[in-house]
Amino acid sequence: MKIAEIKEMTTNDLVERVEAETANYNQMVINHSISPLENPAQIKQLRRTIARMKTELRQRELNNK
C-alpha cells in the first residue's frame, strides 16, 4: 500500500485496517514458523505497511491537538 493511499483513508478506516493487518501479520509469522512461506519477503512488506499506517495515525493525532 502506498503512502498516498494511506493518507486518503479516514482515521476510522486506518484503525480498522491496522487491526486487520496486524492479525494477518501475526498469522503469517505463525504459519511461517510451522512451514516456510513461498515468499517470506511478504512478512517484511506487511510489517512495513503496518508501520506506515501507524505513522499516519500518529501524525493525525499530533496535528489535531
From Swiss-Prot:
Keywords: Ribonucleoprotein, Ribosomal protein. GO terms for biological process: translation. InterPro entries: Ribosomal_uL29, Ribosomal_uL29_CS, Ribosomal_uL29_sf. It comes from the Bacteria. The keyword Ribonucleoprotein applies. GO terms for cellular component: ribonucleoprotein complex; ribosome. GO terms for molecular function: structural constituent of ribosome. The keyword Transcription does not apply. Belongs to the universal ribosomal protein uL29 family. This is Large ribosomal subunit protein uL29.
